[in-house]
């Protein structure tokens, strides 16, 4: 089990600001998107303070600003841009050994819509 002070989460833009800054109900350190838009320094400073040298990144795609692209289950405006997410994860890799990367909640909406449209057509079937 990894101690709570060695976890970090990036908050969704739509969550209550009190939840997004400081600590969430589980005691995890959290950063809202506004703290990471311009720089990864707050996250890197926190990481340095933990003493951890290895990092596992769990990337929820709905943290990406839905005004730029909708990758997740719903639309969540105000998140980080794709470039900002890339920078944050790359910066983590420059300052630690990234040993894991998961991508979560990706919904291939276009593929699902196309499958539904084609279902039952000749040569496709059910």
Per-range role (PLM):
Residues 20-126:
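Catalytic cores of soluble, metal-dependent hydrolases
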Residues 5-24:
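Low-complexity basic/metal-binding stretches
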Residues 1-6, 95-96:
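Active-site histidine-anchored catalytic micro-motif
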């Amino acid at each position: 089990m990894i101690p709570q002070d060695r976890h970090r989460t990036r908050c969704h833009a739509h969550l209550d600001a009190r939840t997004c800054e400081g600590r969430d109900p589980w005691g995890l350190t959290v950063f809202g998107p506004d703290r990471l838009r311009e720089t990864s320094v707050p996250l890197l400073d926190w990481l340095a303070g933990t003493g951890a040298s290895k990092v596992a990144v769990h990337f929820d795609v709905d943290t990406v600003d839905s005004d730029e692209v909708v990758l997740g289950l719903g639309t969540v405006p105000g998140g980080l841009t794709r470039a900002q997410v890339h920078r944050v994860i790359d910066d983590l890799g420059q300052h630690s050994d990234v040993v894991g990367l998961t991508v979560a909640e990706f919904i291939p909406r276009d593929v699902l819509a196309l499958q539904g449209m084609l279902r039952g057509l000749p040569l496709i079937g059910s």
